[in-house]
Amino acid sequence: MNYNNQTIHKKQCVMNELQQALDKIHSADTLIIGASNGLSISEGIHIFGSNQDFYDHFGDFAQKFGFNNIIRGCFYPFAPENYWAYFARLYHYMNIKRPVTAVMNDLYQLVQDKNYFVVTSNFDNHFRLAGFDENRLFEIEGVGKDLECQTCQSVFDGTDILTQLAQIENGEIVTSDIPKCQECGGELKIHVQLDEHFVFDKTWQQKRHAYQDILAQGKHGNTVLLELGVGIRNQLIKQPFMQYTYQNPNAFYISVNKGDLWIPDEIANRSVGINGDLASVIHDWATR
């Protein structure tokens, strides 16, 4: 009996936290969304996972090169032909094999009428595919559909190129298939920050300024920082979000993650932490 009472109390606390967070989202003048790997995992994309899904889609690369998850493949020192075979496969996986799910659709439904902005370290392109406004989306470490030239510092949409490469049978790309920069003919890479040569082009700079602008704007109103699937050691999103909340008395911080939550005492009275399944939490909010 006592166990049942404790269970009921725990469920009630969770429901109260969900409602408090939703009320804050609804009343926000400005909503800043920060998303990382946990959100991708909720959609079935686990770049750190050494799981059956990885071997089903990248097993030939695993067998040939010895890595056991997507992210290790991203850092592998491939020969150029294998590099493009891998990243074309990864593009196809993230955009076609693992399309946008109800998680992103629910999130968009929840926030579409708000003054929102998204900052994310995910490079799967799913915010864009779900309909989020391009001008209110800052993919801080790039996106796997774009290509960059480190010679002339240009960045452009690589959708057509990656789609064509992904269709080459067995991923057997040859030297003549390797794309070149449309501006200078230089060597291309995927526009994802994997080393110190990442191209911070004009569009990236504009997105950064837009992010800074909405943070400044948020200081003058009721601002909610909604953090989705961000680990406690994240320096790109979590630390700035917590610091912003600490420095701005009108800010409220919401962190949703499964089994990986931390809220400092200094902002605890203006925060809610929800330890739960992202898909379930977002669906609950979108359908209340």
What is each PLM-predicted segment?
Residues 2-288:
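Conserved catalytic alpha/beta core of Sir2/sirtuin-type deacylases, generalized to analogous enzyme cores
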